[in-house]
Amino acid sequence: MALILTDEQQMLKESAKGFLAEHAPVKEVRNQRDADSETGYDKNLWPKMVEMGWGAILVPEEFGGLEFGNVGMAQITEETGRTLTASPLLSNAIISVSLIKEIGNQNQKSMLLPKIASGELMMTLAIDETSHHNPERVSMIASENGERFILNGTKRFVIDGSTADKLIVVARTNQDSHDKSGITLFIVDKELSGISVERTKMVDGRNSTFISFNDVVVEKEDILGEKHKGFEPLSNVLDIANVHLAAELLGICQETFDRTLQYLKQRKQFGSLIGSFQALQHRAANWWSEIEICKSVVLKALQAFDENDARSSFLASIAKAKLCEIAELSTNEAIQMHGGIGMTDEYEIGFFIKRARPAQMLFGDHNYHVNKFASKCGY
């Protein structure tokens, strides 16, 4: 498939660009940070996104969605990278929707997907338990007790966990913390007895949550998918999430480049525009070339998921690893080429590095995905 957008996808991209420029410009990052928002994002923005149909893009048409695919959705996530827009788009409309439509039963799909699409329901994934992403190693236990399960354990770095109505909890239904076949997913109401949520403000101003489960009782019907068989679909959806994170990082790379290029054309030093200095020209040219490669890498990975390509997992790790690398290059170069003013809070360029670093770490950093790719290749 050609690495170009369809007319409809390009229209969605332009629509997202215009909407975010009007309703969520980069200056809103400072406003949300200074307001110390409990949600970690503008609570008035998400309903507007839902009105734009963004909550329904990955939802099948039979459940009130648009079914526009990952390539379409990524045009939005890329633009949110350009404007640093915080929202539950990733946790709710991408990860949760993808898991439910892939392994949910008919009742779960009909009950949950229309509500997510309409903005009535907020969900997120609770998976990580340590400071490093490792979906294979799950220590949280789900003990079977008749027709019920009792959950005990903790989850860290749960994105939008403080605002979600329900959690998709990854737990172990056997005793071996390294056994992939013993992982089960549960849909858990966050208000159940025994659940405690501790909000943490991250460097980008968004929320991360630490959630404790102490003898939390859930029903067998709350299992998402099949008992003991949650790892494979979970891994697939984590790949999808990582490609969308790569798309967001691509937006960050492009915006930092564009802003820095304008600065190089305006800032004078030693009587000359600094953009005329050959050393900076070479660095900028290398930076631009890397971004162009990233565009193709991300689009190819997105197309692979929409086409059910067997190589999708490989391509997801390539995309995330590459964008982690170039996002680091982009944010570092942006600050360095801006000089001292790039380090000041009054200048917006510093906000991009503060968002890029958490996005790079979420669901596996550069090293994690390089190792994952190498392992899949037999090394």
Regions found by a protein language model. Give the residues of each.
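A short core secondary-structure module
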Residues: 152-196
